[in-house]
């Protein structure tokens, strides 16, 4: 789980006479992540596409264009089918003619309808003007302009124009119609020239007759006819979609497979008579891979497991592990050219020695069990893990839901989150990202419900505490509390301490991962300087903080939270002082934890001097985890406020012993007894205890308030938990940048070969 699946570099070398059979077999196995040949070997060239590649590519483009026209998706497919070349020749051509013809007609109709809509938009000013369209054009001695503008400005411009002998202006609500008789010696289009400076915007006069209303009615009737015809064409296309969907989807799949197979030689190193193909496969699949090819072509190819990617102390990202020959197998020894030492590879097509095309990074196949796999989406949101580093998915699986559940901690909210997650997980099987987020949400909801039971809360009400922990189990209160009321303030302080301890543990794991990675990739020196130093500093500092050396200086609750009388009675009251000597100037003990911190700082300064200025990160990063307690109290406070407004809250006892209670059944008066305690104060009477109107308002407040708390739980608890994982945890060891495993093959969905 912490390491990706082991990958092996394999080579397939053989005669071109069997290349097509090898390609078909390898494609069917869907195992080989092919390494692209870069043309660097003398005497070897990238292969040429097989016969039919161009034809298949052209057909594939045609099929996808038809699918786009018909708006097909995977849900439109019928049962799987066999698609033959003859069917492609005949049926595809017929479908193409019908669909393209209908699509052309649809586009033509849509264009005509758009033109009519433009005409109708244009005719509106003329309807406002109220003059027949045939009266607005066709004159020999008059010029006409229609548009919008300021009438007084237009008339002033016309009055001052010597080139205009006479004019008349007609007006509608927003439209002006101007009829002008130019002088005998005036230039053509003189009216347009006069109106240029008159704040007038001209509108093109349509070439039509009759009133604007008649013209608009005629065009609307024409549009109705075209829309009816368009509906008919759409119905024919929908019918064509129903009839052709299964064939087109299956044809696309077959042609995609054909294109993959025929273009595969482009990645091979070839001569006139031989080929070499290389790539990565999961190591445990090599025997199956080898056997399948040998069954297909016999001994006319040489199949070798050239190397296995592993970790080592040679300073490289990954190195090659020699593969011992299998008894009876064809795997050969890896010569020095195939190692990761930069040796030159001698390219031979006779299988005499293994050949490495490229010292490429192995693809990363995350090796996580089913229940953990949805959390890969959170890791890949940052980056796919590199093959050389730990996959932190399992850690996110163990910590993210716990962080989230602890911060929300409510059975009601947990059930809702779990239901949402279950819905996403079960209804989006064809959308892996949504399905994975559903799995994450489901886990977060389960932990929220578990912590809600421990807190004794359901939608912010302490009903579980009352009826389960106090009524059935017989406890005085729930096993743990959030600490909102004055009587429970020690819990709130205790959660701050717990948050710090969680941060220390979480960061220890992160730097241990980094330590192991540096140890495997480099050496002990790198591991100690880059990660061991931080481990020493962080643990030294926080052991010192939790030791008696700071007693009387640090807050008392740091030492009392876990004492026998504390809220979490584990019997821990702090570490001993562990003094080594007294510092003369400040008269304070220099302790063993401080020495450990100092050693870590010196190691960091020697190994990574630039990072030494960030030594306080061991304090800051850990304190960042107190956001867990902060969000816990904030979310609890929001739910408490919503319930306070609806049910009301009364107080029993006073001062540091004061406890808050919701008025679920009724609101007692001050001075009366409730559950054996005197009511000392009413914080709020509660909308539910008022009139019918306040009850209605209260119901709205209750529903909307809890929905808001539910939504903000994602944006607060969810984002804060993710931030702790990404910023505090990942930054200590995770680089990412891994390559996705893309095997040569196809997962058939619409076709079958049988």
Task: Kindly label every feature range from the protein language model.
Residues 1-391:
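Long, charged N-terminal accessory/stalk domains
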Residues 1-8, 15-30, 34, 293-295, ...:
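Conserved, carboxylate-rich catalytic/transport cores that coordinate ions
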